[in-house]
UniProtKB/Swiss-Prot annotation:
It catalyses: GTP + H2O = GDP + phosphate + H(+). Residues 1-445, 489-541 are cytoplasmic. Keywords: Acetylation, Disease variant, Endoplasmic reticulum, GTP-binding, Hydrolase, Magnesium, Membrane, Neuropathy, Nucleotide-binding, Phosphoprotein, Transmembrane, Transmembrane helix. The gene is ATL3. Expressed in the central nervous system and in dorsal root ganglia neurons. Expressed in peripheral tissues (at protein level). It comes from Homo sapiens. SUPFAM superfamilies: Interferon-induced guanylate-binding protein 1 (GBP1), C-terminal domain, P-loop containing nucleoside triphosphate hydrolases. It is linked to Neuropathy, hereditary sensory, 1F: An autosomal dominant sensory neuropathy affecting the lower limbs. Distal sensory impairment becomes apparent during the second or third decade of life, resulting in painless ulceration of the feet with poor healing, which can progress to osteomyelitis, bone destruction, and amputation. There is no autonomic involvement, spasticity, or cognitive impairment. GO terms for biological process: endoplasmic reticulum membrane fusion; endoplasmic reticulum organization; endoplasmic reticulum tubular network membrane organization; protein homooligomerization. Its EC number is 3.6.5.-. Residues 1-25 are annotated as: N-terminal hypervariable region (HVR). Residues 57-305 form the GB1/RHD3-type G domain. This is Atlastin-3. One of its GO terms (cellular component) is endoplasmic reticulum tubular network membrane.
């Protein structure tokens, strides 16, 4: 397996080759370590493209194509390249070119395995003059195909979010229709991007275009932009009778993008879909597909349609785009953002959390019946016995509840449940102990006993002439009396609880030492009595 450094070096060499050679090409700028599911920005490659002298300070237009793998994203981008090169060289209206000319540019091929990994951009940045005379830099971006066999949900979300955050036009490439799961994935990915842009107060992203490929219902909605917009309006319509989840998805999309459009493309033809030798020649592509291409590409890239990249209302230059790439990739390399989860994992977590909460309620309610607020003091042994009984009852309930994810997945939640039950039991023990009358009056009893004992000791020592010792005992009596009055005030007012805790701790320590001493003395007396009995019996004989 190549190390990230070697992969980065290889990509940098590829970028250098593309820049040094007369022929432009795709350059990998975001590298994906699929085994480690990590990302790395090739700053050198990206800088070599965006910091060229003639474009570095121009406002940038970034057109990105994203979507599921093997759905023809790179194929569409190559037609965009044809259009831009045609406009650059001659501005000829027949930008599609020679019917016999193979399609070149971003790497693409037929088949079922993904061709692009990470994010690539075209090494040549196109300078286009808008109708007002302003020059802008146009960058084309290609992304890793989402949901291939090696990509996690986080991988897909990160790539989609990065491309959306750095593009002014995000083309969401879909096959045949806009399904509900497509919208849910879009919601997840854009929210993952919005999390990283926490300082954005406006709509965080600019233009989103749903590009629906292989559209099979032109009799309902015609090919192209007009039919696409009518179809999109219906698909994204929010109705009162819709489920809240469905409404939230649609509201989220509208809240994220300043402009949302849709374009319906027909199938490119049987030769394109099935022939392993197809190389992109126009003669092999269906006529109606080429007709719609001639409407789609100029709609996106016509100088009057170009939209500069903006972040928080400010236009971004090529130099600024490099800095944003560097900032965003650091966010996704860190651990500050939550990891997006699959629908199965999220549902399994919800199932287990609900089962654990229900089991916890069973334990809590049963313990409340035994030693709740209004219940009398309970022996600690009986309380522990009830705890074990109700804990097992709660665990049995958790295990019997049907949950998704399997036993291994649920075991972690069972352990968390046991920890929570342990904490509840400790709280019940403390609450039960506070009901013990002796426990309640333990501190004042110890203090009062100490006052009486020291007062008697003071009188006796004074009677036999030990005035210094008597005065010392009197001082101690005064201190204990102050402690007793202070403890009473704290219990009454609820203030200075730390001081009250210190007095309680001191009283408990004195009581423990006294009890231990009395216990040891009693054991010694009993032992002496047992040992001394045989000798007395012998003397009697």
């Amino acid at each position: 397996m190549l190390s990230p450094q070697r992969v980065a070096a290889a990509a940098s060499r590829g970028a250098d080759d593309a820049m040094e050679s007369s022929k432009p090409g795709p350059v990998q700028v975001v590298l994906v370590q699929k085994d480690q599911h990590s990302f790395e920005l090739d700053e050198k490659a990206l800088a070599s493209i965006l910091l060229q002298d003639h474009i570095r300070d121009l406002d940038v237009v970034v057109v990105s194509v994203a979507g599921a793998f093997r759905k023809g994203k790179s194929f569409i981008l190559d037609f965009m390249l044809r259009y831009l090169y045609s406009q650059k060289e001659s501005g000829h209206s027949n930008w599609l070119g020679d019917p016999e000319e193979p399609l070149t540019g971003f790497s693409w091929r037929g088949g079922s395995d993904p061709e692009t990994t990470g994010i690539q951009i075209w090494s040549e940045v196109f300078t286009v003059e808008k109708p007002g005379g302003k020059k802008v830099a146009v960058v084309l971006m290609d992304t890793q195909g989402a949901f291939d066999s090696q990509s996690t949900v986080k991988d897909c979300a990160t790539i989609f979010a990065l491309s959306t955050m750095t593009s002014s036009v995000q083309i969401y490439n879909l096959s045949q229709n806009i399904q509900e799961d497509d919208l849910q994935q879009l919601q997840l990915f854009t929210e993952y991007g919005r999390l990283a842009m926490d300082e954005i107060f406006q709509k965080p992203f600019q233009t989103l275009m749903f590009l629906v490929r292989d559209w099979s219902f032109p009799y309902e909605y015609s090919y192209g932009l007009q039919g696409g917009m009518a179809f999109l309006d219906k698909r994204l319509q929010v109705k009162e009778h819709q489920h809240e989840e469905i409404q939230n998805v649609r509201n989220h999309i509208h809240s994220c993008f300043s402009d949302v459009t849709c374009f319906l493309l027909p199938h490119p033809g049987l030769q394109v879909a099935t022939s392993p030798d197809f190389d992109g020649k126009l003669k092999d592509i269906a006529g109606e597909f080429k007709e719609q291409l001639q409407a789609l590409i100029p709609y996106v890239l016509n100088p009057s349609k170009l939209m500069e990249k903006e972040i928080n209302g400010s236009k971004v230059t090529c130099r600024g785009l490099l800095e944003y790439f560097k900032a965003y990739i650091k966010i996704y390399q860190g651990e500050d953002l939550p990891h997006p989860k699959s629908m199965l994992q999220a549902t399994a977590e919800a199932n287990n959390l609900a089962a654990a909460a229900s089991a916890k309620d069973i334990y809590y309610n049963n313990m409340e019946e035994v030693c709740g607020g209004e219940k009398p003091y309970l022996s600690p042994d009986i309380l522990e016995e009830k705890h074990c009984e109700f804990k097992q009852l709660a665990l049995d309930h958790f295990k019997k509840t049907k949950k998704m994810g399997g036993k291994d997945f649920s075991f972690r939640y069972q352990q968390e449940l046991e920890e929570e039950i342990k904490e509840l039991y400790e709280n019940f023990c403390k609450h039960n102990g506070s009901k013990n009358v002796f426990s309640t009056f333990r501190t004042p009893a110890v203090l009062f006993t100490g006052i009486v004992a020291l007062y008697i000791a003071s009188g006796l020592t004074g009677f036999i002439g030990l005035e210094v010792v008597a005065q010392l005992f009197n001082c101690m009596v005064g201190l204990l009396l102050i402690a007793l009055l202070t403890w009473g005030y704290i219990r009454y007012s609820g203030q200075y609880r730390e001081l009250g805790g210190a007095i309680d701790f001191g009283a408990a320590y004195v009581l423990e030492q006294a009890s231990s001493h009395i216990g040891n003395s009693t054991q010694a007396t009993v032992r002496d009595a047992v040992v001394g009995r045989p000798s007395m019996d012998k003397k009697a004989q």
